[in-house]
């Protein structure tokens, strides 16, 4: 692992599951209880904004009580450890929670948006907001009401910061995917891009993902156990 100074880490729902935030695609996941077309699409919001707001208000309330776990803490330690060695961590998450930030990570790219941010459906203005979404919220930017929605990427919408993500991936020495299903694109394609550029790759997950066969190295087990151990090994080799 010597010579690795720029590490690109992609995290998914499996990182936050042990903090009490449910994953989406397992047998007990969020999408087994809700119709994603009704609560996670622009069309669903247009049809029934009250249902969508209720769904995300419940998720905000759940997030308010969540705390970072050992996997989040370890990634914050990795960021600090790389910085001390003159390296860099580029942390890109598919999660809409803020547990990486709460653990101390200074730079986090939320490609699917942030639950604790509200966006105006009318003008796209955003603002920090951990309270309940309300239909009568007036946007400070456009002075219209009725458009408050969570700042999350819904199905059919384009993920955020893709140019920045592609630049960071192309500059990386190591690509690591942690707690992802390997089935949500474009993120699921990052490992193939990394391999094509000759970048070392590693999957850390509870079990093999849909694209596990593409990775050079594989580490399996609960995130709170295997991520701290992997970070410790990596930093010891640098």
Swiss-Prot record:
| Protein name, UniProt field | NAD-dependent protein deacylase
Q: Which GO terms describe its molecular function?
A: histone deacetylase activity, NAD-dependent; NAD+ binding; protein-malonyllysine demalonylase activity; protein-succinyllysine desuccinylase activity; zinc ion binding
Q: Which family does it belong to?
A: Belongs to the sirtuin family. Class III subfamily.
> What Gene3D superfamilies does the annotation carry?
SIR2/SIRT2 'Small Domain, TPP-binding domain
Give the residues annotated as active site: 112
Its annotated function is as follows: NAD-dependent lysine deacetylase and desuccinylase that specifically removes acetyl and succinyl groups on target proteins. Modulates the activities of several proteins which are inactive in their acylated form.
Its GO CC terms are: cytoplasm
For binding NAD(+), which residues are annotated in this chain's numbering?
12-31, 94-97, 179-181, 205-207, 223
Write down the CDD domains for this protein, in alphabetical order: SIRT5_Af1_CobB (cd01412)
Q: Which HAMAP family match?
A: Sirtuin_ClassIII (MF_01121)
The UniProt entry, under Pfam families, shows: SIR2
Question: What subcellular locations does the record give?
Answer: Cytoplasm
Q: Which InterPro entries match?
A: DHS-like_NAD/FAD-binding_dom, NAD-dep_sirtuin_deacylases, Sirtuin, Sirtuin_cat_small_dom_sf, Sirtuin_class_III, Ssirtuin_cat_dom
Write down the required cofactor(s).
Zn(2+)
Q: Which organism is it from?
A: Caulobacter vibrioides (strain ATCC 19089 / CIP 103742 / CB 15)
């Amino acid at each position: 692992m010597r010579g690795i100074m720029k590490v690109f880490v992609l995290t998914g729902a499996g990182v936050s599951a042990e903090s009490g935030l449910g994953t989406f695609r397992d047998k007990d996941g969020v999408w087994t209880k809700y119709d994603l077309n009704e609560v996670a699409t622009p069309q669903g919001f247009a049809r029934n904004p009250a249902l969508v707001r209720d769904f995300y208000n419940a998720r905000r309330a759940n997030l308010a009580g969540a705390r970072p776990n050992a996997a989040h803490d370890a990634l914050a330690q990795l960021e600090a450890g790389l910085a001390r060695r003159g390296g860099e961590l580029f942390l890109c998450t598919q999660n809409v929670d803020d547990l990486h930030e709460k653990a101390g990570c200074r730079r986090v790219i939320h490609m699917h948006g942030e639950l604790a941010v509200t966006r105006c459906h009318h003008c796209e203005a955003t603002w920090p907001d951990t309270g309940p979404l309300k239909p009568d919220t007036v946007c400070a930017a456009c002075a219209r009401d009725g458009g408050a929605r969570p700042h999350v990427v819904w199905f059919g919408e384009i993920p955020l910061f893709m140019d920045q993500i592609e630049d960071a991936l192309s500059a990386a020495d190591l690509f690591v995917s942690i707690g992802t299903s390997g089935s949500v694109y474009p993120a699921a394609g990052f490992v193939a891009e990394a391999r094509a550029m000759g970048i070392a790759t590693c999957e850390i997950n509870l079990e093999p993902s849909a694209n596990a066969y593409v990775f050079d190295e594989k580490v399996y087990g609960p995130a709170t156990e295997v991520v701290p151990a992997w970070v410790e090994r990596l930093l010891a080799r640098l």
